[in-house]
């Protein structure tokens, strides 16, 4: 459709990467990309293949690229009153917090170990995870 012009000539392409709250909390707060010194910007981590596909679809070089975002939420000064340093340290905010580690890694219907979700629990341990190994992995010093 693009190549034969049946939908006209594309002038711009807007692409959005929607990362679920529990996915973001795992990958960019607790997970492999939690440290900007050791990882890549989110646009490279989440969108490099998207950009390849867009380049192929457009059959043209990109002239402008914009990415928006900053560390504005997961900071110590934004923590709720009564929050512990770590979720598993008896956090007073556990029940109302959507980012609670036990919810994300054990009970969340999309990501929880107890629901059979697989990822992200299966990347926290070297061996196939058990509840004990997941709790141990989540308690590794910051």
Outline where the language-model segments fall.
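Predominantly a Rossmann-like dinucleotide-binding segment in NAD(P)-dependent oxidoreductases
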Residues: 1-137
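Glycine-enriched catalytic-core subsegment of oxygenase/oxidase enzymes
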Residues: 138-142
């Amino acid at each position: 459709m693009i190549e034969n012009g049946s939908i006209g000539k594309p002038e711009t392409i807007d692409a959005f990467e929607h990362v679920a709250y529990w996915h973001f909390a795992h990958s960019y707060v607790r997970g492999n990309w939690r440290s900007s010194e050791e990882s890549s910007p989110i646009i490279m981590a989440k969108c490099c293949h998207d950009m390849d596909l867009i380049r192929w679809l457009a059959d043209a070089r990109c002239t402008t690229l914009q990415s928006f975002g900053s560390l504005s939420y997961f900071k110590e000064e934004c923590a709720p009153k009564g929050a512990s340093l770590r979720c598993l340290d008896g956090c007073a905010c556990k029940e109302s917090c959507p980012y609670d580690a036990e919810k994300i890694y054990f009970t969340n219907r999309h990501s929880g170990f107890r629901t059979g979700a697989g990822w992200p629990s299966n990347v926290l341990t070297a061996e196939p995870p058990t509840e004990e190994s997941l709790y141990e992995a989540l308690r590794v010093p910051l």
